[in-house]
Amino acid sequence: MSRFFVAGYNSDSSSEEEDLLSSDEELLSSSSEGEQETSDDDSLDFDDQSDSDSSDSDSDGRPSGPAYFLKKDFMKGGAGGDSDSDSEDEGRRVVKSAKDKLLDDMNESIEAINVARRSDTWTTVVSEFDKLGRLLVRAGQQSVSTPNAYIRCLADLEDYITATSENEKTEKSLNAAEARAFNMAKQRVRKQIKEYQAQYDLYRENPELFEREESVDIAAPSRSDVPVEDTTGRVLSPVFTILKQIAETRGKKNIDKYEQIKTLEDLLNDNLAKGSVFELISIYQMLLSIRFDASANQNFMPIEQWKNNEADLTSLIGLLESNKDTYQLSELGSTTDDIDIEPVANESGVKAIFGSITSLIDRLDDEFTRSLQNTDPHSIEYVQRLKDETTIYQLIVRGQSYIESITPAEVQQSVEQLSRVVLRRLEHIYYKPDQLIKANEAEAWKGISHESVIVSKDSTPAELIEGLSSFLTKHKNPVYAKHALLFSVYYYAVNNNYNRAKELFLDSQIFNKIHHADSSLQVQYNRAIVQLGLSAFRNGAVEESHKVLNEIVNSQRSKELLGQGFNSKYPNQATTVEKAKLLPFHQHINLELLECVYSTCSLLIEIPALAAATNSKDSRRKATTKSFKSKLEFHDRQFFTGPPESIKDHIVHASIALSKGDWAKAYQLLSSIKIWKLFPDNDDLLAMMKNQLQVEGLRTYIFSYKSIFSKLSLGKLSQIFELEADKVESIVQKMIETNEIGGTLDESKAFIQFASTEPQRSRLQELAIVMNEKVGLLTEKNEKTSSNGYGKKQPQQQQQQQQQQQQQQQQQKDLLQEDNSRFRYANVNTNNDEFQTTA
C-alpha cells in the first residue's frame, strides 16, 4: 500500500521528520567526534543505552510515520536532548574490558570454592575448580598472567585438604560421592601445584607479594649467549639454557618440534669444536629424542630424519668411545637434580651419565622396520631402503661392543641394556643363510678396534649364533632365553641342519609353555616350527615334515600365525598395533612354497595308504587326509581335464600317475614346478624327491597288484623303478615284517610269494561290508532304545575284553596326541594379545 493512503500522514509530519533527521545526524556526528578514543565495549554500551532510550520515547506516544520501522534506533522519537537527560538521570553504566570480566569470573569461582570447601561440599569444589582451570586457559590465550588469587587459592585448598585428611573423623563423615570428589580435588590440586611450582614456592616464602592485584612474574631463562641464573641460583651456560627450555616444552601442545630440531642442530654445530664432552653428550641425547618425538604421530620416520639420527648416533658412540675413561653413557648411571649437573665420578674417575645407547638403537631399528612395513615390497624403493640394514646392523654391533666395554663382567648377565642389544643383533641374522651372515659381519666390524667378549669377530656364522644364544640363555629373564632358542632353531633349519634344530626344539620342551607367551614370541614359535617342517622335507623326513606342517597349513589363519598379514579381516580394519606386529616382507615365509611342500608330503604318504586299504579294517587303521582325498575325488568327477597349470594341478596329476605306479611321470610333473627353485639346494631336493617317488611308487605297485599276482620278481621291480636290487629287497622285507602285505621271499630272494589268508574283495564288496556293520550298530541302538536304554547283558568275559581293548586304544590315542602336540601351532589372538593352544 502506498504511504499516501496511510491514516494520520500529512506533509507537515513529513517535514518534521526531515528536520528531526537532520538534527539527529548533526548530533551523531558531533558525539562521534568526541568519543573517538572510546573502546568497542563503550560503543556497544552506548547502543544499548540508545535502544533503551528510544523504547522509552516510543512508549510516550510520539508520532510515527509510515517509514518509521526503516529508521535507525537513534532516529526514532523526539529530540536527542530528552534521551540524554534521561540517561544522565539514571546514571552512567560501568563498562568492563574482556580482561576485567575474565578476572571477575575467576574471582567468583575462587569465592565459590572457598564457600564450598568450608561446608565440605567437594563435588562443588571439583566442578568450580574445573571451571577455574578453563578460565585460566582462556587467560593464557589472552596473554593474561596467572592471577595471584589463583596461587592463593591453590595454597589454601592444599592446606584445607591436608587438614581434612589428618582429621579422620571429618573424612569418614563424607558420603561416597563427596569422598570421591575429595580424592579428585586432592589429585587435581597437587597436579596444578606442580605446574605452577615456582609461583607456589614463592608464595610460601613470601605471601605478602601475592596480596596485591598485580601478578608476580617468574623470570624465564634468556636465549642470549650470556650465562643466566636459574631459580635455584645456579648460573647456566648458554648450551644448558637452550636445552632446559626445550626440555620444559616436551610433551606440550602447539610446539614446533622441527624448529627445536633446527635449534639443536645449530647448537651442536656451534659447540662441536669448543663445547665440553658433557655438553655434547647432552645435546646429542636431546637432539635424537626430539627427532623421534617429531615422527611419533606419523606412520614412519622420514628417511632424511632417520639418516640424520643414524649419523648423529654414530657420532655419539664415537664420542663416547674416545672419552671412555672420563665419561660413560649407561643405564647404570646416576641421575642428577638438573640437566646441567654432572654426575659424581666413581673410584676410577669415570662419570657415568644416565642414558641408554640400547634404547636409541632400538628406536632407530623400530623406525627402520616401520618404514619397510609402509613401503610397497615389490617396488624399487623397498630394495633401496633395505640396503640401510647393513648400516643399522653395523650400529648394533658397535653399540654392543661399547656396552660390553663399560659394563663390569660380574653384572653382564643381569644387565638389560646388553641383553637387549644382543637380542636385537640376533634378530637381524637368524633368518639369513651363512653366506649373507658372513658378508654382514665383515662389513659391520670395519672401524671397530676392540674385540667382543661374547663373540669374536672371526667367528663362523654357527659360532656366532651359538655364542649370542648362549649369552641370552644365561640371563635371569627367561624371555631372552626363549627368543634365543627359537632364533637358533630357525637358523639351523634354514641352513639345512635339521637334526640339530630338531634336537634343540624337543629338548627345550618349549611347546608345553608357549601358550603363556606374548605375541612376538608366539609368532616366532610358529615360524620356527614351519621352518623345521621345511627342513625335514629337504632332508627326506617326509612323514615328520607332514606332521609338523599339517595343522598350520590347514588352518585358515596362516598369515596371522606367521605374522605376515591378516586372513580374517581386511587390511584397513587392522589397528595400528596389529600392523606393528607384522614382519617386513623380506622376512616372510613363502606360503605357496609351504603349501607345495605339504601337498607333496601328502602325496607321498596318502597314495600308498589308499592303495593299501584293501578292506574295511585297513581303512579304519589308515585314516587318509580328507583334504587331499577330496582333491583327488573332485578331479575324478571332472569330465574334461586339461594339462596342469597351477601347483595344485601338478600335485593332483602326479598323484594319479603315482597311484598307477608311473613314478617317472609323477617325477616329471613335480620337478616342473618352478617354486622348488626357492630352495638353495634345488638339485639335491629334486634328487631326494625322485628317490622318494621311486620307493613309494614301488610300495603302491605292490599294494595295488598283490591281489592279482601270486608272486612278483624282485629283479623286474628293480628294473621298473630303477632301484638297486638290495634296496628293493629291504623295502619288500620291511613291508612283510610290518604286516603291510602277507607273503614271503623265496630262498633265492628273487621272488616275493603272496600268501594271505584275508579274502581279496572288490571295492563293491568292501562297501557292502561297511554298510552291514553300520546297520548292525543301528540295530543295537534301536534295541537299547526299545528297552529303556538297557541292552542285553553281555557275558563278563566279553565285557573284560572290551574294556581291555578300550584301554589299549585310549593309551595309543594319548601317545599319538602327545606326539602331535609337540608341533601344535600357537593360536595368536591379535585383538587382545592372548594366546591359546589349539585343541
From Swiss-Prot:
Annotated keywords: Cytoplasm, Initiation factor, Protein biosynthesis
Claim: Cytoplasm is one of the keywords in the record: yes
Low complexity: bias regions: 794-812
Residue span(s) of domain PCI: 585-759
InterPro entries: EIF3C, EIF3C_N_dom, PCI_dom, WH-like_DNA-bd_sf, WH_DNA-bd_sf
Annotated PROSITE patterns: PCI
Top-level taxon in the UniProt lineage: Eukaryota
Feature: compositional bias, Polar residues: 827-839
Biased composition (Acidic residues): 14-27, 34-58
Subcellular compartments: Cytoplasm
One term of GO molecular function: translation initiation factor binding
Residue ranges, annotated region (Disordered): 1-93, 783-839
UniProt-listed GO biological process terms: formation of cytoplasmic translation initiation complex
Xref: SUPFAM superfamilies: Winged helix' DNA-binding domain (SSF46785)
Chief place of localization: cytoplasm
Annotated GO CC locations: cytoplasmic stress granule; eukaryotic 43S preinitiation complex; eukaryotic 48S preinitiation complex; eukaryotic translation initiation factor 3 complex, eIF3e; eukaryotic translation initiation factor 3 complex, eIF3m; multi-eIF complex; proteasome regulatory particle, lid subcomplex
Role summary: Component of the eukaryotic translation initiation factor 3 (eIF-3) complex, which is involved in protein synthesis of a specialized repertoire of mRNAs and, together with other initiation factors, stimulates binding of mRNA and methionyl-tRNAi to the 40S ribosome. The eIF-3 complex specifically targets and initiates translation of a subset of mRNAs involved in cell proliferation.
Similarity annotation: Belongs to the eIF-3 subunit C family.
Assembly information from the UniProt record: Component of the eukaryotic translation initiation factor 3 (eIF-3) complex.
Protein name: Eukaryotic translation initiation factor 3 subunit C
